[in-house]
Regions:
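A non-catalytic, helix-rich entry segment at domain boundaries
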Residues: 48-119
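An N-terminal structural lobe/cap that precedes and organizes the functional/catalytic core
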Residues: 3-4, 8, 23-24
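Metal-dependent nuclease catalytic regions and adjoining charged, substrate-binding loops involved
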Residues: 7-8, 95-100, 128, 158-159, ...
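Hydrophobic (often cysteine-bearing) scaffold residues that line and stabilize catalytic clefts
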Residues: 37, 41, 87, 162-165
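Short amphipathic alpha-helical segments and their helix-coil junctions
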Residues: 20-32, 145-151, 218-222
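Nuclease catalytic cores
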Residues: 13-57
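Short, compositionally biased low-complexity segments
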Residues: 15-23, 56-76, 181-193
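Non-catalytic protein-protein interaction segments used by genome-maintenance enzymes to assemble
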Residues: 111-176
């Protein structure tokens, strides 16, 4: 890479793999492109859950209102056929849904210790002179890392297994000396269908997959 940077983020690597041209526009040329409604919703929802789990918000709906306002102000959004008010109300519906609330309580607070939110990790890779950084959404008290997702439709087990992000987090945790018991990872998928729900996928990775991960990131760097 001919430009000077002092680190890579996992999100930038993921963006590059999806579309190199879009990555260049965003990270190198600094060209601002309209944000999608799905990204606005996901970011606001993600932040709301983290605020609540971190004890920084007494009410999920109050936190959602504040985060929605933050995400919708000061940036260009391509709403397309989506209606902002409907998306905002969908967030309220999800955060007041009794099944989702019960699942969150049973999933995040089943042990004596509180979950850890937004853990920064760094991964060093041979032939890549800068660290790869990322932030793990949640590490529950059983030491299993996890990631929050929002989706317009239900996930499948295969989709969860196809995600490369968990392998990066697990490799970074292992390198930094965190416990990685069984190389387990969880996805918490908040599905914004007519009847919303929370899906929890736990899957196991193989330490041997690290070499594939290293090779993939080395190719991105070159």
């Amino acid at each position: 890479m001919p430009y000077e940077i002092n680190h890579l983020s996992y999100s930038s690597i993921s963006s590059y793999l999806m579309c190199a041209a879009a990555w260049k526009f965003h990270y190198i040329d600094k060209i601002q492109t309209p944000t999608s409604p799905a990204l606005v919703f996901g970011s606001a929802f993600h932040n709301t859950i983290e605020q609540w789990l971190g004890g920084k918000a007494e009410s999920l709906t109050d936190a959602w209102s504040k985060e929605w306002q933050k995400q919708t102000e000061g940036q260009v959004i391509d709403w397309g056929t989506d209606i902002p008010e409907e998306l905002f109300n969908k967030g309220i519906d999800m955060l007041t849904n009794q099944d989702i609330l019960a699942e969150m309580q049973n999933t995040f607070f089943t042990h004596a210790e509180m979950p850890v939110i937004e853990t920064k990790v760094e991964l060093s890779i041979p032939a890549v002179p800068v660290p790869i950084i990322g932030y793990i959404d949640i590490i529950t008290s059983d030491k299993v890392p996890g990631d929050f997702k929002t989706s317009s439709k239900s996930w499948t087990t295969d989709k969860a297994l196809d995600e490369t992000q968990p392998l990066f987090y697990l490799a970074a945790m292992n390198q930094m000396g965190f416990p990685v018991d069984g190389w387990r990872f969880r996805h918490y998928v908040f599905v914004k269908t007519k009847t919303p729900k929370l899906q929890v996928f736990e899957h196991v990775h193989n330490p041997g997959q690290i070499m594939w991960l290293f090779g993939m990131i080395q190719k991105v760097w070159k």
